[in-house]
């Protein structure tokens, strides 16, 4: 019996700290074509990250830091692709949502797998959060490696919090009652 599910496993070794750089320019295009970002910080990568490089290429001032829990960040928007490790990803996202709610930044955009918001434990990030603005579903699978040897196996979405509201699109409702 086969025990390795190809839908879950890519066949590649995991990168240290899940440091998958967002090198596919379509990801940033999907975000910036709908939301005006004046300047940004990527809290999960130092300068030279894929997100920082792509934003700068579009003429948007951007920088990166490697500590998502730093006290102060400099930028109107946080734009990031957090690591996938369950033990840390929710802490990182919740810390960035706190920055939005306190007014330290105008907005937050996180790039995560489409099913990220399906977890009951994340209900507070989305349905119960008035700063949650919506999502941008990308109708392509981002490429994470320059070699072109592998096809991505997961769909991705930008989740948005902050002053920007995505209007003219269907509302998302999270239903979690079991009875």
Q: What positions do the PLM features span?
A:
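Class I S-adenosyl-L-methionine-dependent methyltransferase catalytic core
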Residues: 1-179
């Amino acid at each position: 019996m086969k025990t390795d599910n190809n839908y879950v496993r890519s066949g590649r070794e995991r990168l240290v700290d899940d440091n998958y750089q967002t090198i596919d320019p379509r990801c940033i295009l999907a975000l910036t074509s709908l939301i005006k970002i004046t300047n940004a910080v990527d809290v999960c990568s130092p300068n030279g990250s894929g997100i920082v490089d792509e934003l700068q290429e579009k003429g948007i001032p951007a920088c990166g830091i490697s500590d998502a829990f730093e006290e102060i960040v400099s930028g109107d928007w946080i734009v990031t692709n957090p690591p996938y490790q369950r033990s840390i990803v929710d802490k990182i996202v919740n810390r960035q949502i706190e920055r939005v709610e306190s007014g330290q930044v105008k907005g937050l955009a996180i790039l995560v797998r489409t099913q990220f918001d399906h977890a009951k434990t994340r209900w507070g990030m989305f349905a119960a959060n008035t700063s949650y603005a919506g999502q941008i579903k990308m109708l392509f699978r981002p490429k994470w490696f320059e070699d072109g040897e592998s096809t991505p196996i997961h769909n991705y979405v930008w989740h948005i919090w902050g002053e920007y509201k995505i209007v003219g699109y269907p509302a998302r409702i999270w239903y979690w009652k079991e009875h």
